[in-house]
A protein has these predicted regions:
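Cap/insert and terminal regions of metallo-dependent hydrolase folds
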Residues: 55, 64, 72-169
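Binuclear metal-dependent hydrolase catalytic cores
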Residues: 1-65, 145, 149-178
Length: 185
């Protein structure tokens, strides 16, 4: 498309850097298997009208990474992620004063709360739990929860290793899981 051509030209980058091959699938199961790396999709609950919705289990050389996908409280994730090396989980949150307002509650019904995420982490016991895709809701006079408030809420119910993902953060999965924050540019 023209946008890609312009960006490639402006930045003097080869077009092959943006080539991508997609493969659509309509049911859960193994979606990739090459050289010992397997990716298996599984269905997750993101609400009655948001289907299908997928999570992913990635396995390689005895290591396991699970991505919940954008989901509400779904304990299938906990079972699939049992004793994984790394569990990425989405989250939605609002302060107590506004979480039951109709518009806020409607959005939260499609997401896992911090307390629910803590229960999933406690049950699955990953080497590292990582919060991704945070839907943080607020209203005038009621700002969204801060990342510190999110961490404190989760740590009230879960005492394992935990971090909140940032763009360009890297993870090294081995005997231990190492977090490498994005490089300062």
């Amino acid at each position: 498309n023209d946008d890609i051509k312009i960006r490639s030209s402006d930045q003097r980058l080869p077009l092959r850097g943006v080539e991508i091959e997609t493969k659509e699938f309509l049911k859960c199961g193994q979606v990739f298997n090459q050289d010992g790396l397997t990716v298996t999709s599984f269905e997750t609950d993101h609400g009655e009208k948001i289907k299908p919705n997928w999570g992913y289990k990635i396995q390689y050389l005895g290591r396991t990474v699970v991505i919940s996908g954008d989901s509400k409280n779904d304990f299938r994730v906990s079972e699939i992620a049992k004793n994984s090396d790394l569990l990425f989980h989405s989250l939605g949150a609002a302060k107590d004063e506004i979480k039951n307002l109709d518009d806020i509650n409607a959005i939260l019904q499609h997401h896992t709360t911090p307390k629910e995420a803590a229960k999933i982490f406690s049950s699955s016991r990953p080497k590292l739990a990582v919060i991704i895709h945070m839907v943080l809701l607020g209203k005038p006079g009621f700002p969204p929860m801060t990342t510190m408030e999110i961490l404190e809420t989760i740590q009230t119910y879960y005492n394992g290793p935990l971090t909140i993902a940032e763009d360009l953060m890297k993870f090294e999965v081995g005997e231990k899981v190492k977090v490498m924050p994005k490089a300062n540019t």
